[in-house]
């Protein structure tokens, strides 16, 4: 929604300001310039990326127009889930989690948090490392190094669509110049025409430079920034899981471990200490929480 609002602001201010100076919008309508700039940009995108990158970019574009699912309440659910898993392992032993991690969809603990279940990346990250911890064949430092490696791989993969769009955005001003030069060449080839017609041809040629810059910095490049922001949110969730599980492995009690995880979150979504404490207390005493809700 914000993207569409931003586009409207760009269009309204740029073209509105042009009209205020006495310009005619019809002079800016040059389909041939759009074909040159857009076609060259798409071609450069295809040339500069392999099939996997192109597919990933196409898959990422619809995500731009969806609201972020990583809200404060989802972070609370994540920390509550981790708390319940760690508390169960403390009370019943690590092997008590085997059924939960082998089939999370049938686990009573995981089923209480459908948003985590629906996030395949996050679910796999949690389950895979709990499985490694249960195996007992790796120490804390090895697990931390493996987590860092996976998070780094995730970041690299998430950067591909953003970099692809950024490359297209960076190329559009140059393709606008190409379109403008071609228009100037056409105008110079028509030098025998009256001055009024020649001036119109040169004006049409200059539209190419205008469109290239506008499309690049007003429409395409901002999308790359949004993609990076969205991928950073997923990375932050993974870092939260990492810090929480490692804290538990280092001997901290589950309430302290989730506090470690809370401190890694962005301030805009981070619950306060009191909020998290009350949420954890509700998880400890579900019957009390249900009675309160019914009252």
Curated annotation (Swiss-Prot):
GO BP annotations, alphabetical order: bacterial-type flagellum-dependent swarming motility; chemotaxis; proton transmembrane transport
Cytoplasmic side: 52-170, 223-295
Topological domains annotated Periplasmic: 22-33, 192-200
Transmembrane segments: 2-21, 34-51, 171-191, 201-222
InterPro entries tied to this protein: Flag_MotA_CS (IPR000540), Flagellar_motor_stator_MotA (IPR022522), MotA-like (IPR047055), MotA_ExbB_proton_chnl (IPR002898), MotA_N (IPR046786)
Keyword Transmembrane part of the UniProt annotation: yes
Cross-referenced NCBIfam families: MotA1
The protein's role, per its UniProt record: MotA and MotB comprise the stator element of the flagellar motor complex. Required for rotation of the flagellar motor. Probable transmembrane proton channel.
Family, per entry: Belongs to the MotA family.
Assembly behavior: Each stator complex is composed of 4 MotA and 2 MotB subunits. 2 A subunits and 1 B subunit are thought to form a single ion channel, so that each stator complex contains two channels.
PANTHER family in the cross-refs: CHEMOTAXIS PROTEIN MOTA, MOTILITY PROTEIN A
Protein's UniProt name: Motility protein A
